[in-house]
């Protein structure tokens, strides 16, 4: 018997995996990912980058349309609904993170909500249909990342969601559309030609477009494959194919369907407690511990008493921003997150408003920060740590270290805290009743007979009293909501 190519084995898995292959752990973990992603998306609709992306997308029209989450007055063609919802999800860097490093959910979920609403089907798409396609999209991303040692570390060249996310999106769309194994293979080949975005756009308004484009291009790849477009049949096997994105690419054939095991069963995701790059969560935890030695819990930090702040972190240049000037730079700044936590005792959504970033006390603390890169502190979300030392002018030094923050896969958020995060995020755009209904539906998603129940709730409406995009600025972070 002729051995399958790597590309063919992926197509076989995408086409052949069934609801019965889903394990209870995979179902439970993916429902948490879906809830968290929806919340990040609703909150993201308050951002400037979402507004720009949605205004751009309104120039397109179609006979079929899908919901833009939390925006009852905006309907777009499915590809553009997926695009703007993907942009919203990543607009504050508040979405989930996996290992090897990527944001897995943001490129996949918008595809499925857009298709579930726009495409006629009898019987209707069920919650199990959505869960299966979602997990196929997540699985494809994880398998591809495991083919390159480079992917274990934080990226230096390509932003992973723009690479593996595009193929995960295409896989999820292909599964949802019921494409044949041959068409699934073509969709992957087409998606590879849409993949890739440079890390140079990290900490800018353009970075969220990486997730939106991955979602959009994945749908396009599946539709084009369905219509007969063909690509290289070994695109995942070749150095000049998907291997172009990784210097040490070494792909392997996927397990057979009969003995298939999901990567999500083995490796959970991390959920963020505040909207910033995942690596800054270690810094925040270490800074919070040091702060307890300096002042009482709710007391103001006397910044003039501090002589020196040393951060011992992995050497990740795109999160090394000594004096951030925008919210996106602050979200990618070890220095800013450490200083904000020392000063305020907490990091929240308003921590990244420019009026908070530019406070004189923050700039004073930033000027006292030094970075050290211990050789054992590697730039991998699975093994990195952060140590912070604060030296006072009287010579006293206080040091603490974080090896695992709350929300990391080794110390996962409780279901209660995950739901509270969703409530805080989604309530910016939705009524309380709608928020609670969404929590209930996602919790029981495998029992949902018709996904239109879910997509109807995603529309809104947006209560006027919570629809403001720009809360008034105040130098006291506790006065911001």
Curated annotation (Swiss-Prot):
Variant or mutagenesis effect after changing residue 97 to A: Strongly reduced cis-aconitate decarboxylase activity
Biased-composition ranges, Polar residues, are 467-481
What happens after mutating residue 97 to M?
Strongly reduced cis-aconitate decarboxylase activity
Q: State the tissue distribution.
A: Expressed in LPS-tolerized macrophages (at protein level). Expressed in peripheral blood mononuclear cells (PBMCs), microglia and macrophage cells.
Give the recorded effect for residue 273 to H.
Answer: Does not affect cis-aconitate decarboxylase activity
Coiled coil spans: none
Q: What is the effect of changing residue 159 to A?
A: Abolished cis-aconitate decarboxylase activity
Mutagenesis or variant effect for residue 277 to Y: Strongly reduced cis-aconitate decarboxylase activity; reduced protein stability
What ranges does the record give for the region Disordered, renumbered to this chain? 462-481
Named from the GO MF annotations, one term is:
protein homodimerization activity
Keywords, A to Z? Antimicrobial, Immunity, Inflammatory response, Innate immunity, Lyase, Mitochondrion
Q: Kindly indicate whether the keyword Mitochondrion belongs to this entry.
A: yes
Subcellular location(s) of the protein: Mitochondrion
Q: What induces it?
A: Up-regulated after lipopolysaccharide (LPS) stimulation. Up-regulated in LPS-tolerized macrophage by LPS. Up-regulated in peripheral blood mononuclear cells (PBMC) of patient after acute sepsis.
Q: Which reaction does it catalyse?
A: cis-aconitate + H(+) = itaconate + CO2
Q: Which InterPro entries match?
A: MmgE/PrpD_sf (IPR036148), MmgE/PrpD_sf_1 (IPR042183), MmgE/PrpD_sf_2 (IPR042188), MmgE_PrpD (IPR005656), MmgE_PrpD_C (IPR045337), MmgE_PrpD_N (IPR045336)
Annotated Gene Ontology cellular components are: mitochondrion
Which GO terms fall under biological process for this protein?
A: cellular response to interferon-beta; cellular response to interleukin-1; cellular response to lipopolysaccharide; cellular response to molecule of bacterial origin; cellular response to progesterone stimulus; cellular response to tumor necrosis factor; cellular response to type II interferon; defense response
Q: What is its EC number?
A: 4.1.1.6
Enzyme superclass (EC): lyase
Q: How does activity depend on pH?
A: Optimum pH is 7.0.
Which SUPFAM superfamilies does its entry note? 2-methylcitrate dehydratase PrpD
Family in the record: Belongs to the PrpD family.
Quaternary organization: Homodimer.
What is the documented function of this protein? Cis-aconitate decarboxylase that catalyzes production of itaconate and is involved in the inhibition of the inflammatory response. Acts as a negative regulator of the Toll-like receptors (TLRs)-mediated inflammatory innate response by stimulating the tumor necrosis factor alpha-induced protein TNFAIP3 expression via reactive oxygen species (ROS) in LPS-tolerized macrophages.
| Name under which the protein is recorded | Cis-aconitate decarboxylase
């Amino acid at each position: 018997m002729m051995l399958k190519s790597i590309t063919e084995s992926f197509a076989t898995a995408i086409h052949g995996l069934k609801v019965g292959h889903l394990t209870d752990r995979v179902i439970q973990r993916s429902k948490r990912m879906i809830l968290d992603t929806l919340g990040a998306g609703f909150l993201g609709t308050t951002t400037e980058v979402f507004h720009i992306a949605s205004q751009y997308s309104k120039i397109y029209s179609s006979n079929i349309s899908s919901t833009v989450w939390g925006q009852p007055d905006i309907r777009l063609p499915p590809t553009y609904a997926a695009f703007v919802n993907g942009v919203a999800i990543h607009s504050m860097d508040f979405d989930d993170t996996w290992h090897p490093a990527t944001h897995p959910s943001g490129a996949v979920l918008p595809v499925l909500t857009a298709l579930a609403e726009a495409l006629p089907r009898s019987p209707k798409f069920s919650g199990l249909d959505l869960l299966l396609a979602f997990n196929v999209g997540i699985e494809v991303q994880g398998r591809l990342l495991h083919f390159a040692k480079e992917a274990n570390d934080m990226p230096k060249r390509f932003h992973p969601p723009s690479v593996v996310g595009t193929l995960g999106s295409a896989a999820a769309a292909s599964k949802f559309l019921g494409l044949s194994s041959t068409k699934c293979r073509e969709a992957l080949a087409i998606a590879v030609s849409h993949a890739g975005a440079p890390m140079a756009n990290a900490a800018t308004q353009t970075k969220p477009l990486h997730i939106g484009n991955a979602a959009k291009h994945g749908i396009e790849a599946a539709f084009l494959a369905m219509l007969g477009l063909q690509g290289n049949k070994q695109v995942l096997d070749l150095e000049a194919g998907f291997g172009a994105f990784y210097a040490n690419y070494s792909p392997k054939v996927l397990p057979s369907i009969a003995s298939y095991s999901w990567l999500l069963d083995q490796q959970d995701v991390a959920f963020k407690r505040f909207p910033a790059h995942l690596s800054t969560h270690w810094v925040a935890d270490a800074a919070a511990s040091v702060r307890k030695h300096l002042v009482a819990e709710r007391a103001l930090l006397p910044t003039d008493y501090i002589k020196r702040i040393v951060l011992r972190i992995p050497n990740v240049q795109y999160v090394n921003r000594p004096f951030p000037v925008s919210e996106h730079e602050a979200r990618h700044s070890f220095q800013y997150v450490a200083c904000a936590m020392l000063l305020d005792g907490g990091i929240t959504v308003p921590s990244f408003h420019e009026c908070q970033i530019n406070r004189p006390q923050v700039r004073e603390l930033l000027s006292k920060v030094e970075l050290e890169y211990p050789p054992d502190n590697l730039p991998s979300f699975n093994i990195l740590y952060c140590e912070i030392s604060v030296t006072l002018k009287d010579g006293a030094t206080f040091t603490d270290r974080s090896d695992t923050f709350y929300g990391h896969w080794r110390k996962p958020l409780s279901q209660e805290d995950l739901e509270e995060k969703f409530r805080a995020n989604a309530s910016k755009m939705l009524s309380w009743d709608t928020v609670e209904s969404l929590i209930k539906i996602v919790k029981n998603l495998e029992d949902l007979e018709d996904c239109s129940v879910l997509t109807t709730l995603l529309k809104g409406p947006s209560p006027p009293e919570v629809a403001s995009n720009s809360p008034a600025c105040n130098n006291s972070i506790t006065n911001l909501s």
